[in-house]
Amino acid sequence: MSLISKPGKYLRMYAGMLMRRDPGLIVFGAWLGERFADNSKELFLEAQAREGIRAVWVAKEQAVIDEINSLGFEAYLWGSPEARSIQQRAGYAVISNGISDLEHTYLGGAVILDLWHGVPLKKICYDDRYEKNWDSPKQKIRDFLINIPLGKEYYVATSQTFVPIYQSCFRKNPDHILCLGQPRNDLFFRERPEPYYPGKRVIL
Protein backbone atom coordinates (compact mmCIF):
# COMPACT_ATOMS: atom_id res chain seq x y z
CA MET A 1 0.00 0.00 0.00
CA SER A 2 1.43 3.38 -0.99
CA LEU A 3 2.01 6.23 1.42
CA ILE A 4 -0.67 8.18 -0.46
CA SER A 5 -3.34 5.51 -0.05
CA LYS A 6 -2.69 4.90 3.65
CA PRO A 7 -3.97 8.32 4.80
CA GLY A 8 -7.01 7.84 2.58
CA LYS A 9 -7.70 4.48 4.20
CA TYR A 10 -7.64 5.94 7.69
CA LEU A 11 -9.72 8.94 6.65
CA ARG A 12 -12.42 6.60 5.31
CA MET A 13 -12.38 4.65 8.58
CA TYR A 14 -12.87 7.80 10.61
CA ALA A 15 -15.51 9.13 8.21
CA GLY A 16 -17.44 5.91 8.80
CA MET A 17 -17.86 6.92 12.42
CA LEU A 18 -19.96 9.88 11.28
CA MET A 19 -22.33 7.79 9.18
CA ARG A 20 -25.65 6.50 10.43
CA ARG A 21 -25.49 2.73 10.74
CA ASP A 22 -28.45 0.39 10.53
CA PRO A 23 -28.64 -2.02 13.51
CA GLY A 24 -30.73 -4.41 11.43
CA LEU A 25 -28.07 -4.70 8.72
CA ILE A 26 -25.28 -7.21 9.36
CA VAL A 27 -22.38 -7.82 6.99
CA PHE A 28 -20.50 -11.13 7.10
CA GLY A 29 -17.14 -12.33 5.86
CA ALA A 30 -14.61 -15.11 6.48
CA TRP A 31 -11.12 -16.28 5.62
CA LEU A 32 -9.86 -12.98 4.21
CA GLY A 33 -12.90 -12.75 1.99
CA GLU A 34 -12.07 -15.91 0.08
CA ARG A 35 -14.51 -18.50 1.46
CA PHE A 36 -18.11 -19.04 2.53
CA ALA A 37 -17.24 -21.05 5.61
CA ASP A 38 -16.69 -21.42 9.32
CA ASN A 39 -18.48 -19.70 12.18
CA SER A 40 -19.39 -16.70 10.04
CA LYS A 41 -21.23 -18.96 7.62
CA GLU A 42 -23.23 -20.70 10.35
CA LEU A 43 -24.32 -17.44 11.98
CA PHE A 44 -25.13 -16.01 8.54
CA LEU A 45 -27.44 -18.95 7.80
CA GLU A 46 -29.07 -18.62 11.22
CA ALA A 47 -29.63 -14.90 10.66
CA GLN A 48 -31.62 -15.60 7.51
CA ALA A 49 -34.41 -17.06 9.63
CA ARG A 50 -34.62 -14.03 11.92
CA GLU A 51 -37.13 -11.28 11.22
CA GLY A 52 -35.84 -7.75 11.11
CA ILE A 53 -32.32 -8.77 10.12
CA ARG A 54 -30.77 -8.22 6.72
CA ALA A 55 -27.71 -10.45 6.54
CA VAL A 56 -25.31 -9.85 3.65
CA TRP A 57 -22.10 -11.65 2.72
CA VAL A 58 -19.09 -9.97 1.08
CA ALA A 59 -16.43 -12.06 -0.68
CA LYS A 60 -13.59 -11.69 -3.14
CA GLU A 61 -14.45 -14.70 -5.29
CA GLN A 62 -17.33 -14.65 -7.77
CA ALA A 63 -17.80 -18.39 -7.20
CA VAL A 64 -18.53 -17.69 -3.53
CA ILE A 65 -21.04 -14.99 -4.46
CA ASP A 66 -22.74 -17.36 -6.90
CA GLU A 67 -22.93 -20.10 -4.26
CA ILE A 68 -24.64 -17.81 -1.75
CA ASN A 69 -26.96 -16.31 -4.35
CA SER A 70 -27.98 -19.83 -5.42
CA LEU A 71 -29.20 -20.40 -1.85
CA GLY A 72 -31.43 -17.37 -2.22
CA PHE A 73 -29.32 -15.12 -0.02
CA GLU A 74 -27.72 -11.74 -0.56
CA ALA A 75 -24.01 -11.45 -1.35
CA TYR A 76 -21.82 -8.92 -3.12
CA LEU A 77 -18.36 -8.92 -4.61
CA TRP A 78 -15.53 -7.36 -2.64
CA GLY A 79 -14.77 -3.84 -3.89
CA SER A 80 -18.07 -3.39 -5.70
CA PRO A 81 -20.19 -0.29 -5.02
CA GLU A 82 -22.89 -2.52 -3.49
CA ALA A 83 -20.45 -4.23 -1.11
CA ARG A 84 -18.93 -0.97 0.04
CA SER A 85 -22.32 0.63 0.55
CA ILE A 86 -23.41 -2.31 2.71
CA GLN A 87 -20.24 -2.15 4.80
CA GLN A 88 -20.57 1.61 5.27
CA ARG A 89 -24.14 1.26 6.56
CA ALA A 90 -24.04 -2.03 8.49
CA GLY A 91 -24.51 -1.72 12.23
CA TYR A 92 -22.69 -5.00 12.78
CA ALA A 93 -19.89 -6.89 11.06
CA VAL A 94 -19.27 -10.60 11.68
CA ILE A 95 -15.91 -12.19 10.93
CA SER A 96 -14.01 -15.39 11.75
CA ASN A 97 -10.33 -14.64 11.17
CA GLY A 98 -9.78 -10.93 11.56
CA ILE A 99 -10.79 -7.52 10.28
CA SER A 100 -9.38 -8.36 6.84
CA ASP A 101 -12.26 -10.82 6.35
CA LEU A 102 -14.07 -7.67 5.17
CA GLU A 103 -13.03 -4.31 3.77
CA HIS A 104 -12.43 -2.87 7.21
CA THR A 105 -11.70 0.52 5.68
CA TYR A 106 -15.49 0.91 5.51
CA LEU A 107 -16.32 -0.42 8.98
CA GLY A 108 -15.50 2.63 11.08
CA GLY A 109 -18.03 2.88 13.90
CA ALA A 110 -19.57 -0.55 13.32
CA VAL A 111 -19.79 -3.18 16.06
CA ILE A 112 -17.45 -5.98 14.99
CA LEU A 113 -18.00 -9.52 16.25
CA ASP A 114 -15.04 -11.81 15.73
CA LEU A 115 -16.28 -15.36 16.19
CA TRP A 116 -12.77 -16.71 15.64
CA HIS A 117 -12.16 -20.11 14.05
CA GLY A 118 -10.89 -22.33 16.84
CA VAL A 119 -9.38 -22.26 20.31
CA PRO A 120 -5.93 -20.82 21.10
CA LEU A 121 -3.78 -23.93 21.38
CA LYS A 122 -0.78 -21.96 20.14
CA LYS A 123 0.55 -18.43 20.55
CA ILE A 124 -1.37 -16.07 18.28
CA CYS A 125 -1.53 -12.37 17.48
CA TYR A 126 0.05 -10.19 20.18
CA ASP A 127 1.31 -13.24 22.06
CA ASP A 128 3.24 -14.48 19.02
CA ARG A 129 6.47 -12.53 19.32
CA TYR A 130 7.92 -14.24 16.23
CA GLU A 131 5.27 -12.89 13.84
CA LYS A 132 6.33 -9.24 14.15
CA ASN A 133 7.44 -6.67 16.68
CA TRP A 134 4.05 -5.76 18.11
CA ASP A 135 5.55 -3.10 20.36
CA SER A 136 7.51 -1.21 17.73
CA PRO A 137 6.69 2.52 17.45
CA LYS A 138 5.26 1.99 13.96
CA GLN A 139 2.97 -0.82 15.11
CA LYS A 140 1.82 1.13 18.16
CA ILE A 141 0.88 4.12 15.98
CA ARG A 142 -0.99 1.84 13.60
CA ASP A 143 -2.87 0.17 16.46
CA PHE A 144 -3.75 3.53 17.99
CA LEU A 145 -5.12 4.89 14.71
CA ILE A 146 -7.19 1.78 13.98
CA ASN A 147 -8.54 1.19 17.48
CA ILE A 148 -10.48 4.44 17.45
CA PRO A 149 -12.76 3.72 14.45
CA LEU A 150 -12.64 -0.07 14.91
CA GLY A 151 -12.60 -0.12 18.69
CA LYS A 152 -16.05 -1.69 19.06
CA GLU A 153 -14.66 -5.14 18.34
CA TYR A 154 -15.67 -8.16 20.42
CA TYR A 155 -14.24 -11.68 20.47
CA VAL A 156 -16.11 -14.89 21.24
CA ALA A 157 -14.44 -17.34 23.63
CA THR A 158 -15.78 -20.85 24.11
CA SER A 159 -15.26 -20.96 27.89
CA GLN A 160 -14.01 -18.93 30.83
CA THR A 161 -10.72 -20.83 30.55
CA PHE A 162 -9.91 -18.99 27.35
CA VAL A 163 -11.06 -15.52 28.39
CA PRO A 164 -7.70 -14.43 29.91
CA ILE A 165 -5.87 -15.94 26.93
CA TYR A 166 -8.02 -13.91 24.53
CA GLN A 167 -7.47 -10.80 26.61
CA SER A 168 -3.74 -11.25 26.21
CA CYS A 169 -3.47 -12.30 22.57
CA PHE A 170 -5.94 -9.68 21.31
CA ARG A 171 -5.11 -7.04 23.94
CA LYS A 172 -8.74 -6.44 24.76
CA ASN A 173 -10.47 -5.55 28.01
CA PRO A 174 -12.56 -8.29 29.68
CA ASP A 175 -15.82 -6.67 28.56
CA HIS A 176 -14.77 -7.20 24.94
CA ILE A 177 -14.46 -10.97 25.36
CA LEU A 178 -17.83 -12.72 25.12
CA CYS A 179 -17.93 -16.18 26.65
CA LEU A 180 -20.41 -17.89 24.34
CA GLY A 181 -19.92 -20.72 21.88
CA GLN A 182 -19.00 -21.24 18.27
CA PRO A 183 -21.99 -21.21 15.89
CA ARG A 184 -20.56 -24.08 13.86
CA ASN A 185 -20.92 -26.32 16.95
CA ASP A 186 -24.60 -25.54 17.53
CA LEU A 187 -25.48 -28.38 15.17
CA PHE A 188 -24.54 -30.90 17.85
CA PHE A 189 -26.85 -29.40 20.47
CA ARG A 190 -30.10 -29.20 18.52
CA GLU A 191 -32.78 -31.63 19.58
CA ARG A 192 -33.84 -32.17 16.00
CA PRO A 193 -30.97 -31.02 13.83
CA GLU A 194 -31.84 -30.21 10.28
CA PRO A 195 -29.91 -32.08 7.59
CA TYR A 196 -26.58 -30.30 7.43
CA TYR A 197 -25.24 -32.35 4.58
CA PRO A 198 -28.24 -33.84 2.73
CA GLY A 199 -27.98 -37.60 2.46
CA LYS A 200 -25.20 -37.84 5.04
CA ARG A 201 -25.06 -38.35 8.78
CA VAL A 202 -22.89 -36.21 11.03
CA ILE A 203 -21.04 -38.46 13.50
CA LEU A 204 -18.22 -36.15 14.68
Task: List each language-model region with its residue ranges.
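N-terminal pre-catalytic "stem/leader" segment of glycosyltransferase-like enzymes
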Residues: M1-E82
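A nucleotide-sugar donor-handling region in carbohydrate enzymes
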Residues: S2-R12, L121-L204
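Nucleotide donor/acceptor-binding cores
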Residues: P23-G24, A110, K200-I203
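A short acidic (Asp/Glu
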Residues: A37-S40, D66-S70, H104-Y106, C125, ...
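Extended catalytic core of nucleotide-activated donor transferases of GT-like folds
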Residues: K41-L45, G72-P137
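Hydrophobic/aromatic beta-strand patches that form the interior of the parallel beta-sheet core
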Residues: V56, Y76, V94, V111-D114, ...
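Helix N-cap/beta->alpha junction signal
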Residues: E61, N97, T158-T161
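A short acidic, often aromatic-flanked loop/helix-cap motif at beta-alpha or helix-coil junctions
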Residues: V64-I65, P81-Q88, N185-L187
